[in-house]
A protein has these predicted regions:
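Generic alpha-helical secondary structure signal
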Residues: 36-37, 207-210, 214, 231, ...
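Acidic/histidine-rich, metal-coordinating catalytic segments
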Residues: 189-205, 225, 277-282
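Basic, flexible linker segments flanking DNA-binding modules
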Residues: 39-134, 286-291
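C-terminal domain-tail junction helix/linker
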Residues: 56, 213-215, 239-318
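Mobile-element integrase/transposase regions
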Residues: 89, 94-95, 99-155, 161, ...
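Residue-centric detector for conserved, function-critical "anchor" positions
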Residues: 1-33, 42-52, 68, 75
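RNase H-like polynucleotidyl transferase catalytic core
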Residues: 192-199, 213-232, 248-253
Length: 318
């Protein structure tokens, strides 16, 4: 309300008070003006009304933070805003919440629509509570030039770390047996993990079952025609093909092995995973979860304090 309008309202209230003898309180109630507003008008009588709508609050992002977020999101537009957020925190680009990142990219039309994935009715197996409790194994096709090869990997169900893998020229059972034996040698501390596989001929063979018995593994088969039962590894295969295979053009088999190894190293040690608090599989696998989350919390708190000081200084000057 402008000063002129406020003065007019005050004069009218005083005029009716003098003319009718009604109390100021009654006239204010009739006019719909709260008594606290009248007292505030009296306190600021003669002073122009100042609105603070345009004064940035202490929790607002600074211009430098907004610029950093925009620049990072433009260069990483294929990733979701939550992954972008925690990558920026981990890489010391900007220390803001996921909702703040979303608001910035939404305001600057940098967001993209995602297909909503409906949750399956079945929730699958009981989830592991530590590493090496559940291992997942499966094959997937990869095309190199004009030939198909077969990627087989073992994924730790708790950390989502790909423990071991091979790129095979066929789907014979010996490839699965070698991979399981190699992985057990790599991680001797794994005491009888539960191996989850589909009902492929490689996994139901007598030789494969004898190997698992020798290694003291338990074996669980997924439901027929229900790949979601092995969903963690199926999701890894999807990520592998979406983020790497379909963007690459392998020259030949050896070239594919080298580049797959590089991407898998990136997946395990750098790529943030939405199912494990947007940490890397190695963070969870090696027990760094609490430390990494605490580091992020400290960064966000420090940035919040600096942001408050920034706006306090700016608002004091203006």
């Amino acid at each position: 309300m402008s000063l002129e309008v406020r003065r007019t309202a005050e004069r009218e209230i005083q005029r009716y008070h003098a003319k009718t003898g009604l109390s100021i309180t009654a006239l204010l109630k009739y006019a719909g003006i709260p008594h606290r507003t009248w007292r505030e008008w009296a306190r600021r009588r003669g002073a122009e009304t100042k609105h603070n709508n345009n004064i940035p609050k202490s929790y607002h992002l600074t211009p430098e933070e907004v610029k950093a977020i925009i620049a990072y999101c433009v260069n990483n537009s294929l990733k979701g805003y939550r992954m972008q957020c925690w990558e920026m925190v981990d890489r010391n680009v900007a220390f803001v919440s996921c909702s703040s990142v979303y608001n910035v990219i939404k305001h600057h039309n940098l967001d993209k629509k995602w297909v909503e994935v409906k949750e399956a009715a079945k929730q699958g197996f009981e989830q592991p509570t530590a590493v090496h409790e559940q291992w997942h194994i499966d094959f997937s096709y990869i095309k190199i030039q004009n030939s198909f090869y077969y990627f087989i990997g073992i994924l730790d169900g708790y950390s989502r770390k790909l423990l071991n893998w091979r790129l095979c020229k066929n789907m014979e059972g010996i490839n699965a047996e070698i991979l399981v034996a190699e992985t057990k040698e790599m991680y001797p501390q794994a005491a009888g993990p539960r191996l989850i596989s589909d009902n492929g001929s490689q996994f139901i063979s007598k030789n494969f079952e004898e190997l698992l018995a020798l290694l003291e593994f338990s074996h669980t088969f997924t439901s027929a025609n229900h790949p979601q039962s092995n969903g963690k590894l199926e999701r890894f295969h999807r990520t592998l093909k979406t983020e790497h295979v379909r963007r690459s053009s392998y020259l030949e088999y050896q070239d594919a092995c080298i580049r797959l190894a590089e991407w898998i190293a990136y997946y395990n040690s750098e790529r943030l995973h939405s199912a494990i608090w947007y940490l890397t599989p190695n963070d969870v696998f090696y027990g760094r979860t609490a430390v990494r989350l605490a580091e992020r919390k400290e960064k966000l708190h420090t940035a919040y304090i600096k942001r408050q000081e920034y706006w306090r200084t700016r608002n004091a000057v203006s």
